[in-house]
Amino acid sequence: MLEEFKKFALRGNVVDLAVGVIIGAAFGAIVNSAVQDIFMPVIGAITGGLDFSNYYIPLSSKVQSGLPYVDAKKQGAVIGYGQFLTLTLNFAIVAFVLFLVIRAMNRLQLAETKKPDEVPADVKLLSEIRDILATKPRV
């Protein structure tokens, strides 16, 4: 049974998946940092620090107006559309940052594939000899 588990765990697909999950988690942290530390402050500055997360519609007369969303939920039923707007905006920004990163990676890969392979020195020398011999008349 241990040998069978060893075969399963060390198969290429399982190892590739594990590497992908680990890299994905690390990449997710980078993207989240870009969103929270770079893009959201800019959006906050543009909107004057507007916080959508406290926008809600009270469904109960028990809910006092002007309360933060968390406190309003404790008093009664509310539709918290502000939190939905915040998460939707966050998703759009994450998707855009991911698009920019993947676009940059694709451009780097494209630039890398466009580089012509350098001809090895021995092949270059043989080509020169061939060209010289081709210009000489045959006897």
Swiss-Prot record:
Which GO molecular function terms does the record list?
mechanosensitive monoatomic ion channel activity
Please name the PROSITE patterns in this protein's record: MSCL
Keywords of the record? Cell inner membrane, Cell membrane, Ion channel, Ion transport, Membrane, Transmembrane, Transmembrane helix, Transport
Question: Which InterPro entries does the protein's record reference?
Answer: Mechanosensitive_channel_CS, MS_channel, MSC/AndL, MscL_channel
Where in or outside the cell?
Cell inner membrane
Q: Which domain of life is it from?
A: Bacteria
Chain segments annotated as transmembrane? 14-34, 38-58, 82-102
Subcellular location, principal: membrane
**Per the similarity annotation, which family is this?**
Belongs to the MscL family.
Function noted in UniProt? Channel that opens in response to stretch forces in the membrane lipid bilayer. May participate in the regulation of osmotic pressure changes within the cell.
Q: What is this protein called?
A: Large-conductance mechanosensitive channel
Q: Which gene encodes it?
A: mscL
